[in-house]
A protein has these predicted regions:
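Small-residue hinge/turn detector
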Residues: 543-544, 572
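Alpha-helical interaction/regulatory segments in DNA maintenance proteins
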Residues: 515-519, 552, 556, 566-585
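Bacterial signal peptide processing site
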Residues: 25-27
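C-terminal motif of bacterial Sec signal peptides marking the signal peptidase cleavage site
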Residues: 21-23
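Bacterial N-terminal signal peptides that target proteins for export
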Residues: 2-12
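HKD-type phospholipase D/PLD-like phosphodiesterase module
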Residues: 31-80, 90-309, 349-406, 413-428, ...
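Primarily N-terminal secretory
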Residues: 483-524, 530
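Long, C-terminal catalytic modules of enzymes
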Residues: 387-389, 393-398, 403-502
Length: 585
């Protein structure tokens, strides 16, 4: 153990052996930190809660534990001499934007791809537009406004906007950028990548969006330390070539290309897993999505499953969400071979009816006395599945697995059907014990104080359902329409309830492909489980925001009754009355 961060603290002795003291005694306390782990020469790992490191945040000026992920990205960009290609779902950090603008002015070719939901500068929204937003979106906008409002006076000056609104910084520097509408559509399922390629040889691959919430912490929550995320810095021209190929497919001819040549989502050609050597390390990479016409075994989730199945000693998983039934079914024989399996899942998803955490714990949860037909509770179950204790408002946003403390599964790809079959994603498989040790330390940090096993509230819910649902029916699994698969947008799903309220159902927000509809379709019945966003918006009382929430809800659980619809945020008795004769499932 190394000694770090000597801090002065005041200890007030109010009484000792019956003697009252009126003053405080100042005492120096030495804080022990674990020693930094060795890094591989070509593959470095960073986590924003790393206990061996500390840094002072650039925006809130809080000194805290963790690796500064933003600085790692800035350093990589600042080293560029010829090119920087970046694909990231959401980009709000001005430090990264300023580094890109500086390199652009120095003659480096910069290209940026965003998810279209986040491609508009936050400072450009009017007060009226902000007031019309859902509360979650307003909170997100307020977070970004506080980054921009450098002097904290509640007003955004032109100077603050020009220097602190990340997308304005890039636009003023003439950095070319596109989003997933560049293919001529209204947007793909979700452009969920989070990678940077510098000079065709250095890569940043991370689970974090470039936001304060994912990297540092929220302004509104002083105790927030950012959603738990990891970042890989990799030096490999061979691997960079594969990432550049993925980038170029999406970029096409860039801004204003006619006809549109960009390819997103399932428009991209299928490419199987590729393998390269990074020094002495075997690295596999696969880019999502994979069409359902291709076998699951050849998909990104299939690659994850193959890697998990190779375990002989242990599997540790830290996941934002885990809802692919085939993956958990592949894990069960591994468990039966006496392989130790541990899993941590974000509290907002761990105990939902579709969560594979329930299967591993040997239980099922019904919705209206209906169970998913494919559920398969483990026998014997395991008690090493649970949720981490995070600072209020922070999420477990990792998407990693560790096999035998030798192999790491990482990237942007959530372990869901939505990520597998609809989104632009990255999965990396890295066979390197030095790299794995960093992920193992992060897992153990999260697991040390985690709530594992079946919580009492969930146990009571299972017991109550056993009494209320003596005869249960199964919900047959339905294939997701290709144009409506989506994945979770992290900043929109932060559970407001404490861990003691684990039976709640926090709402998540996702996005779907919009397609045009004609006015002649306005009066026909709409299938809520397959309609596009544009079709949903033809229904009375449903605007863009509610249409997106309906799509979010059906990706997690298909609608089977009006009661299911009633659970969607923004739907009430009056709207149900308007909809009941207009919708089917």
């Amino acid at each position: 153990m190394n000694l770090h961060s000597i801090q002065n603290i005041s200890i007030c002795w109010l009484s000792f052996l019956g003697i009252s003291l009126s003053a405080c005694q100042s005492e120096e306390v030495q804080i022990l930190r674990p020693s930094p782990l060795p890094q591989d020469q070509q593959i470095q790992v960073y986590t924003n809660h790393e206990p061996a490191s500390s840094y002072t945040e650039p925006y809130r000026q809080i000194t805290r534990d963790g690796d500064n992920l933003e600085q790692a990205i800035i350093d990589a960009i600042s080293s560029a001499r010829s090119t920087v290609d970046m694909a990231v779902q959401e980009f709000r950090l001005p430090g990264i934007a300023q580094a890109m603008a500086e390199r652009q002015k120095a003659g480096v070719r910069i290209r940026l791809i965003l998810e279209n939901t986040y491609s508009r500068p936050l400072s450009s929204f009017t007060a009226e537009e902000l007031n019309r937003m859902e509360k979650r979106d307003r909170d997100r906008a307020e977070e970004t406004r506080r980054i921009i409002d450098q002097n904290g006076d509640g007003q955004l000056s032109l100077d603050e906007i020009n220097n602190r609104d990340a997308l304005i910084v890039l636009d003023r520097a003439n950095v070319p950028r596109i989003d997933d509408t560049a293919d001529g559509s209204s947007g793909s399922n979700l452009m969920h990548h989070k990678f940077v390629v510098v000079d065709g040889q250095t890569m940043i691959v991370t689970s974090a969006n470039f936001t304060t919430s994912d990297v540092h912490g929220d302004f509104k929550s002083p105790n927030s330390r950012g959603n738990a995320n990891n970042l890989l810095k990799i030096q490999s021209p061979a691997l960079a070539t594969l990432f550049t190929e993925e980038f170029n497919l999406m970029w096409g001819d860039g801004p204003g290309g006619k006809p549109p040549s960009s390819l997103f989502g399932l428009k991209k050609p299928f490419r199987p897993v590729r393998q390269v050597m990074v020094g002495n390390t075997k690295v596999k990479v696969q880019f999502s999505p994979t069409s359902r016409s291709v076998s699951w075994q050849q998909s990104s989730n299939g690659l994850i499953g193959q890697t998990l199945s190779s375990a002989s000693k242990s599997v540790s998983m830290a996941l934002f969400v885990f809802s692919d039934q085939q993956l958990v079914d592949l894990l069960e024989p591994t468990h039966q071979r006496q392989v130790e399996i541990k899993a941590l899942i974000d509290p907002g998803f761990a105990y939902r009816s579709y969560s594979e955490a329930l299967d591993m714990m040997g239980i099922t949860l019904a919705e209206d006395c209906k169970y998913e037909a494919s559920n398969h509770p483990w026998k014997p179950a395991i008690a090493t599945v649970g949720v981490p204790r995070m600072p209020p408002g922070d999420l477990l946003h990792h998407k990693f697995g560790i096999v035998d403390q030798q192999t790491v599964i990482a990237g942007s790809h959530n372990w869901t059907n939505a990520a597998n079959n609809g989104n632009d994603e990255t999965v990396l498989i890295i066979h390197n014990p030095v790299v794995a040790a960093h992920y193992q330390r992060e897992f153990e940090r999260l697991y040390t104080n985690a709530i594992v096993g079946i919580p009492p509230a969930i146990k009571k819910k299972v017991e109550a359902q056993a009494k209320e649902c003596p005869v249960t029916t199964a919900i047959a699994p339905r294939p997701l329409p290709q144009k409506t698969v989506s994945a979770v947008t992290p900043q929109r799903v932060k559970p407001a309830q404490p861990l003691s309220s684990l039976t709640g159902k926090p709402q998540s927000t996702q996005k779907t492909q919009q397609t045009s509809v004609t006015s002649k379709q306005a009066n026909r019945r709409i299938n809520l489980n397959s309609a596009s966003q544009a079709e949903l918006e033809t229904l009375p009382g449903i605007g863009p925001g509610l249409a997106k929430r309906i799509i979010v809800a059906r990706q997690q659980k298909q609608f089977a009754s009006l009661a299911d619809v009633d659970r969607v945020s923004g739907v009430g008795p009056k709207l149900l009355e308007k909809l009941k004769d207009r919708i089917v499932w």
